Amino acid sequence: YVLARELGSKRYGDPDVKLREHPAEILPQEVDALRQMMLDLVQQPEHFQHWFGEFISQSRHELDLAPPEPPYQAGEIYELLQQGEALQRLGGLRVLRVGDRCFVNGELIDTDQLQAADALCQNFSVDAALLGDAVDDPSFLALLTALVNSGYWYFND
């Protein structure tokens, strides 16, 4: 998480460290200094919540993903939802809300459509009624299409 967001610009360093007889030895005070650096980062709520959401929503087992072939276009998903079809969540997929953010399998769902994101988090089956006005939002529909084409949600055949 730290490396992916380039938050690790502050690196551990000790200009007073002496050459050791055993180069693999790490002294307790060095471990304490590194631990303090990590605690300082964890004390920043925005970083901790984001890391926690990514970490806790990652599947611990391989998911039985079956991306649709051919992939759906956003217009197709829109039409199916308008016709009353419902999207089913893949079994074992972790979809969680941490604060006001939604995470799917270790990824932040970046949308302003919080009610629709909440519907994805709380329901194993979602339809146009649950998603509300979000289905008319092209950016949300693009996000939903990406989730379906990843195999995370699917339409029953």
Question: Where do the model's predicted regions map?
Answer:
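Fe(II)/2-oxoglutarate
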Residues: 1-157
